[in-house]
Amino acid sequence: MIKCFDKNNEVYNLIKNLTERLNVEILEINIFRNKNGGKIQIVLYSKNFSLGIDLMTDLHKMILLILEANLKYSFILELSTPGIDRRIKSDKEFQIFEGKKIKLMLDNEFEEGFILEAKSKSFIFKTDSKELNVFYSDVKKARLV
């Protein structure tokens, strides 16, 4: 399992205060640059409320203002939410998605179950027939269902 994106990321540091105040998690930041500018993709999530189109539009406006005032290159900003079949990409995401149903691959087969509890090095995975303590390092693939 890979770790979360670099917290020294300039974009992350510029928007983290806003997202923390609004109780929104930054799951992923991708930055693509070329000679004409760039594209910034940010994936956001909230456990407490739905990030619907109206809220995402407001977030886009606020984040765009912050980034345009601080970044010295032109860019396109794309915001999205994780989606129903998101591949879980970091240990932190198991904590964020605690209680959610996932498909998990440890050996060569997927099993469906729930993330009961996420800890610092492992999580409890519950299927219909068992509960397992799974270390993040043992996870080959995981995705939301």
Swiss-Prot record:
Q: Does the keyword Cytoplasm apply?
A: yes
The record's Gene Ontology biological-process terms are: ribosomal small subunit assembly; translation
Q: Which UniProt keywords apply?
A: Cytoplasm, Ribosome biogenesis
Provide the protein's localization.
Cytoplasm
Domain of life from the UniProt record = Bacteria
Which portions of this protein are annotated as coiled-coil regions? none
Primary place of residence? cytoplasm
A single cellular component GO annotation: cytosol
Q: What does this protein do?
A: Required for maturation of 30S ribosomal subunits.
PANTHER family per the UniProt record, alphabetical: RIBOSOME MATURATION FACTOR RIMP (PTHR33867:SF1)
Q: What family is this protein classified in?
A: Belongs to the RimP family.
User: Which protein are we looking at?
Assistant: Ribosome maturation factor RimP
Organism of derivation: Borreliella afzelii (strain PKo)
Primary gene name: rimP
